[in-house]
Amino acid sequence: MKFNFRVLFPVVLMAFLGAVGFGGQAVAGSATEIDIAVDGGLEKFKKEVAGGAEFLDKAKGYLVFPKVTKAGLVVGGEYGEGALRIGGTTVDYYNIASASFGLQIGAQQYAIVMVFLEDEAMKKFRESKGWEAGVDGSVAIAKWGAGEDINTQNFKDPIVGFVFGNKGLMAGVSIEGSKITKLEK
């Protein structure tokens, strides 16, 4: 029997998230709900990241997932919905999802902001039918000194990711293997 991850993953993830009480919060947001949440996520980003507003203004575009829920009990997963903005305007909606297996227990929520610094990276992302971090493109998770202006950094990767929770920017978090898929809203 052939294992079909694409069919099994959403079923397992939804069952698990529903069981731990995140099902209704994590999925099926309307375009308006997503845009409102993205606005809030961007405000937090600009507050947490010195020079963040200017950095986003210079970007080719940015993808914001304001609430990503990650939960696990041996089998785990993450899910969130967000919007791609170009020039400050929402152009498309996306979800991010991943699955993991192994020793894990618990749940957490965080936000992800992926900033596209090059046109080619943005084009490749938008033309994909399902984009996987680390496979279809590399995302450098931003690391720099607290209070330092982000615009002083010289990023070599075409996509820079920021992950932050209730207590600010999070270190040691990876989005490698996360699948990002366009939503029809």
Put a short name on every predicted segment.
Residues 10-21:
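Bacterial N-terminal signal peptides
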